[in-house]
Amino acid sequence: MRNLLLDQYATADIDQFVGKVLSDLGNPNPPLKLAEVRELLRLGKAFYSSTHDSAIREVAHKLKVAGQPVLARPTILKDIIGKLGLKALLLPDRRRILIDSEVPGQKQRWSEAHQIGHDVIPWHADTMLGDNKSTLTPACHEQIEAEANYAAGQLLFLQDRFLEEARSLSPNLDSVKVLTDRYQNTITTTLWRYVELNPGLAVGAISGHPHRPAVDFSPRNPLRYFIRSRAFSGRFSGVTEADIYAGIQTYCDDRAGGLLGRGEVRLFDNSGQSHVFQFETFFNRYEALTLGSYLRPSHAAVPV
């Protein structure tokens, strides 16, 4: 799945909303304390278990959605959580974020920030759970989720501060790991931001092990996520997931974990010209994370 790149008008508005939150917090240093963000926005937090009906019903007894008691529709939370695969949800009427307790600790941080993102974007109010006035098309839903993801990333990575620090480091996975520790976010979300906010030609991928495919692996959709910088998306719009995955397989070793390898991968731009990218892939025993950084045109001479 490709990352959806928002237009400049949406990002400018969201940057303004997030900037006000960070300013009101005194422009904190990393890592951002989400408890302080919730206190500022007067948001509460509670947990539910997606694997226990009784836990969902216990939460439902206490909540209202769009002004109506959830208890009047006792299966609403269970149905929504199950059908949509939700890991967290925002209940605006109650000023409450609900998080699935089954989600691993560090991933809960992203789920919480995503819901805060929905809360700080004013036009998301009419699309929240239970509002019968707004029925979202799949494309609109994708847009809304991308906007909340962008807001979450701008919060957790403190807007321009992350970009400035990323620029000061070498373009490799070691730098991504440094930023992961500094901002206390998952390496997956850090890689995503590192690539997506890169002003140059950068590409990232999150996939299974390139030499140990899962039972449900699809050659047509080999990547879990295909992340592109805005510059890469514009100049290399014809590059597919299959192209990236094929390149990854050329240099990766069949190791159980850690660095799987580095190598040069050739990709074709929109005019058909070949260019060389430096790729490297790390496997954390759950997913393979790949970063590709631009090196040179294929015909350029290599310094000796």
Regions found by a protein language model. Give the residues of each.
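Active-site hotspot residues in diverse enzymes, especially metal/ion-binding acidic/histidine motifs
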Residues: 1-304
